[in-house]
Regions:
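Phosphate-binding/catalytic loops
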Residues: 85, 91-151
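Helix N-cap/beta->alpha junction signal
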Residues: 16, 90-91
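Conserved active-site segments centered on acidic
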Residues: 1-82, 148-151
Length: 151
């Protein structure tokens, strides 16, 4: 049975979808695709149906990250049971995850940066900072740490 990881951010057009694609790339590179399944979702409804934000897409392409035909979606309460880990990017994500999913009774909701050497850091939203390269680097670092922790 595979480990199921759900990445979460505000709109599901920058950070969480990048984490999904970066994590899947790392899993494939290590020959572990049969052991993991990653997905992504938003806490908000603002961007539902929209593709990856073009500057974030550009950053992923520049780093040779395989990307698919993504459409933003909102996380559903039922997904708490469907995933082994639910990974947020910042405090706001965690707040709204709590409102949507309810109590984290199984301890499966974590910050992505918990898996790095800066566990108290957050991954800032590049929609606002306009720093898509920094977002990519932080997400890459977090995904690498997460995969190392799980293998």
């Amino acid at each position: 049975m595979s480990i199921r990881v759900l990445f979460i951010c505000h709109g599901n057009i920058c950070r969480s979808v990048s984490a999904e694609y970066i994590f899947n790339m790392m899993v494939a590179e290590r020959g572990l695709s049969d052991r993991f399944r990653a997905d992504s979702a938003a806490t908000s409804t603002e961007e539902i149906g929209n593709p990856i934000y073009p500057p974030m897409r550009k950053a992923l392409i520049q780093h040779n990250v395989p990307i698919g035909d993504h459409r933003a979606r909102q996380v559903r309460r039922s997904e708490y049971e469907d995933f082994d880990l639910i990974i947020g990017m910042d405090e706001e994500n965690m707040y709204y995850l709590g409102r949507i999913l309810g109590e984290d009774r199984d301890g499966k909701i974590k910050y992505l940066m918990e898996y790095t050497d800066t566990p108290d850091a957050e991954i800032e939203d590049p929609w606002y900072t306009r720093n898509f390269e920094k977002a990519y680097q932080d997400i890459y670092k977090g995904c690498k740490g997460l995969l190392n922790e799980l293998t």
